[in-house]
């Protein structure tokens, strides 16, 4: 039964990540979540191909 829930969790994750990417689109290089006194920031540093 645990395997069934793990499979569902992986499927949900695999659907959520592309959906989030489509929603965020151009501003994907920086992601910030602010809640009360906590701020979570993820920044992607990359160099585009020339």
From Swiss-Prot:
- The lineage's top-level taxon is Bacteria
Q: Which InterPro entries does this entry report, sorted A to Z?
A: Hok/gef_toxin (IPR000021)
Q: What's the short name of a Pfam family annotated to this entry?
A: HOK_GEF
Q: Which residues cross the membrane?
A: 5-25
Q: Where in the cell is it found?
A: Cell inner membrane
The answer to keyword Secreted applying to this record is no
Q: How does it sit in the membrane?
A: Single-pass membrane protein
- What are the UniProt keywords, alphabetically? Cell inner membrane, Cell membrane, Membrane, Toxin-antitoxin system, Transmembrane, Transmembrane helix
- Which Gene Ontology terms of cellular component type are present? plasma membrane
Q: Which family does it belong to?
A: Belongs to the Hok/Gef family.
Reported function: Toxic component of a type I toxin-antitoxin (TA) system. When overexpressed kills cells within minutes; causes collapse of the transmembrane potential and arrest of respiration. Its toxic effect is probably neutralized by an antisense antitoxin Sok RNA.
What's the name of the protein? Answer: Putative protein HokF
């Amino acid at each position: 039964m645990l395997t069934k829930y793990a499979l569902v969790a992986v499927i949900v994750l695999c659907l959520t990540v592309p959906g989030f990417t489509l929603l965020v689109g151009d501003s994907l290089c920086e992601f910030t979540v602010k809640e009360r006194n906590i701020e979570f920031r993820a920044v992607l540093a990359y160099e585009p191909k020339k």
